[in-house]
Amino acid sequence: EIIPVPDQAAWNASKKSIQINDAIKMRYVEWGNPSGDPVLLLHGYTDTSRAFSSLAPFLSKDKRYLALDLRGHGGTSIPKCCYYVSDFAEDVSDFIDKMGLHNTTVIGHSMGSMTAGVLASIHPDKVSRLVLISTALKTGPVLEWVYDTVLQKDFPLDDPSEFAKEWVAAPGKHDNGMAKNLKTEELAVPKHVWLSAARGFSIINWTAASKYLTAKTLILWGNQNQPMTESMQNDIRAALPKAKFIQYNGFGHSMFWEDPEMVAKDLNEFLK
């Protein structure tokens, strides 16, 4: 029995939860074929599983899709500490164990892609296929700017998009229902999570770790992407020479919001 993709209104109500370790009860949305190979979807900085909601209907129906809320985001536990990429990655590793998943594909966007890459490098046995959307081995100056700006803000935020347009308000033809709901969920992310995750990014450089990665890998990048530059793509392609690389001309950081059908076509081809 295929599990349907929840619509925008039902997205949060459809979340399931599982205690993955002492600190974290993780919330996730599941759709697709429950007996298919698992595909985990990891969202970006201050997003939630909803980031994949407009892409979901275009993905092939034969896989079991699990879109996670990472720690501190969405409905998942919000510990005081810690929010390094390795913490997100170990949570996903614990989720894979607790759910008893095998032959797992991990798709990550932005922060989620770095999480996916670190997971596949540190636990190569747990990830059979890897998709890195708008990724990098280390982050650039955009994050310092976000950090400095968040530091001066009063929380709760009333509108993050005035300063975090790069992340929050990806320009394009994205699903307005998804964008509106996602913005509300981003506003709910506590200040310590915004700041801790941003500090965590500043220490990440998984170039050396990437040599342990064995998963078949696909990298997706839009050439209008401001946070993740072309030189960052050259670096990761040098580190992962076997990876397939697809460039979307005229698309930005969240190209799967701008044209979900286009991106789903490439994902479905890779997941075959």
Curated annotation (Swiss-Prot):
Q: Does the keyword Hydrolase apply?
A: yes
Question: In which pathway is this protein known to take part?
Answer: Alkaloid degradation; atropine degradation
**Reported function:** Alkaloid degradation.
**Catalytic positions?**
110, 253
Extract the InterPro entries matched here. Answer: AB_hydrolase_1, AB_hydrolase_fold, AB_hydrolase_sf
**Pfam family, any one:** Abhydrolase_1
Domain AB hydrolase-1, residue spans: 38-260
Highest taxon of the lineage: Bacteria
Q: Which family does it belong to?
A: Belongs to the DmpD/TodF/XylF esterase family.
**Assembly with partners or alone:** Homodimer.
Q: Give the record's keywords alphabetically.
A: Alkaloid metabolism, Hydrolase, Serine esterase
GO cellular component labels: membrane
MF terms (GO), sorted A to Z? monoacylglycerol lipase activity; tropinesterase activity
Q: What processes in GO biological process is this protein linked to?
A: acylglycerol catabolic process; alkaloid metabolic process
Q: Which reaction does it catalyse?
A: atropine + H2O = tropate + tropine + H(+)
- What is noted besides the main data? The strain used in this study was isolated from the soil between the roots of belladonna (Atropa belladonna).
> E.C. number, please?
3.1.1.10
This protein is called Tropinesterase
